[in-house]
Amino acid sequence: MSIVNGLVNRIDETYDVSQIEKEIKLDNIALSDLELLATGGYSPLTGFLGEEDYDSVVETLRLANGSVWSIPITLPVTEKVAESLKAGEEVKLVNNGNIYGVIQIEDIFVPDKEKEALLVYKTTDEAHPGVKKLYERPNVYVGGTIILTKRFENNQFPSYHLDPIETREAFKKRGWKTVVGFQTRNPVHRAHEYIQKSALEIVDGLFLNPLVGETKSDDIPADVRMESYEVLLQNYYPKNRVFLSVFPAAMRYAGPREAIFHALVRKNFGCTHFIVGRDHAGVGDYYGTYEAQEIFTNFTIEELGITPLFFEHSFYCTKCEAMASTKTCPHGKEDHVILSGTKVRELLRNGEIPPSTFSRKEVVEVLIKGLKKEVVTE
């Protein structure tokens, strides 16, 4: 266990867990968080947040020591389980009958979930998927440092499932000094492509890092999305300037706060820049269009350790006959074809084929095939 180049490493597969009797069952969110804590994806965190750090993150978007951190990474347990635990003991972390790690308990506390919902998600509305999940999870939090004792098998995308130390190495091998990260939970449409390629003009490489952890039920499945990224990169991007790897975290849908979180995590993966677009990590109408960009004004680039790149919403302009944004196009809204992942999903689900101004034909073919498969299995 160590910290090298600012990256936490909490992996020890030789760690003896045979004498540890107690266990905590992890849900899928906690399981993906355990992995990212251990591999350094969540550096400087070394475990699930204790009460002091939790309160500080919820209230100030910083850890108790002042480091920027915007999303509480917590380990919820039921009241019954909490009664059997005490600070100072080691407990196994289990999912599906497998022991994946241990936690050295430092803290057991009851959070104010309403306050967490209001400050982190800016709403207590249970129609919000992040708030819904927050309330569904157990009501007591356990804080403490973790050790990952077993690497996950059955990763859905083994060749794309890389630790921060591996992506950093890959960028170095390619000679990239500057790397821009792009977070997505949707297939890449033409507006995304325009933004990514605009960013590529000013950096050495693009790190396409789709989130493949838990998402809401109407998001396009990760395997379909991954195939869509592969065909897009293969046909429309210079191979030596892009790198694809998955981000195994769960989606929080926390808008502005999640934008900060996504930037900090991509810094750990080796990025120097991070793209923040319209309504980053948003859902419904809970956040303002550019609120996820505005939140960055509360922090300096030095303390973030990564430079955010802000982009206006892009569209296809029928007069320019090209992708553009309000910064580059003089024409009115009547000439703009607005693109969004939601719109693409809507068209596909209605049996319509998105036009080439929306999505590359190779991507559309993958999505249609995926949707047919989804219908068959439902």
UniProtKB/Swiss-Prot annotation:
Pathway named in the protein's UniProt entry: Sulfur metabolism; hydrogen sulfide biosynthesis; sulfite from sulfate: step 1/3
InterPro entries from the UniProt entry: ATP-Sase_PUA-like_dom, PUA-like_sf, Rossmann-like_a/b/a_fold, SO4_adenylyltransferase_pro, Sulfurylase_cat_dom, Sulphate_adenylyltransferase
GO MF annotations in UniProt: ATP binding; sulfate adenylyltransferase (ATP) activity
Origin superkingdom: Bacteria
Gene3D superfamilies for the chain: HUPs, Sulfate adenylyltransferase
Its EC number(s): 2.7.7.4
Keywords attached to this entry: ATP-binding, Nucleotide-binding, Nucleotidyltransferase, Transferase
Transport keyword on record: no
UniProt GO BP: hydrogen sulfide biosynthetic process; sulfate assimilation
Catalysis performed (reactions): sulfate + ATP + H(+) = adenosine 5'-phosphosulfate + diphosphate
UniProt record similarity statement: Belongs to the sulfate adenylyltransferase family.
NCBIfam families: PRK04149.1, sopT
Protein's UniProt name: Sulfate adenylyltransferase
Organism per entry: Bacillus cereus (strain B4264)
Gene (UniProt): sat
